[in-house]
Amino acid sequence: MARTPGWESEYREYVATRRRPLMRTAYGPIPDAQFAQAQDWQSAYTTSVGDVLVMMGHAEELGGWRCRDCDEEKVAGGTLYRQDYSTDAGATWWFTISFVRDDGSFVNVLESVGAPDQQGARDQRHVSDAQMAALARDPRLTF
């Protein structure tokens, strides 16, 4: 599986300096002065084969956690969910790890890969499930 060197350190820098808040009632970023009203934070990265998206939010952002057909693992502080799927008849595959804390807040880490089939997409991934799970459980990703 291919890895992007320095990806984790680039992510840490992004968390520290370039997060943009979103509000459920607004489409897109809110003004920096209103950051305390944000209900979720999102950051996106483009890779050579797709994208990586990191989202974190309050429990009320989703109205309760739902994940049909997810693999579920209880871990310290919450539950990890894993799901692989395609939304466009197999042209793009999504590999998803979600961490739902005991208080209902969450972090989703998604990697999209364009490939003709799931195994081809899996072989091209830049971020492993273990890396995604560690990122989702990063204690800095909280309100």
Where are these regions (language model features)?
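Intrinsically disordered, low-complexity prosegments and terminal tails associated
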Residues: 1-143
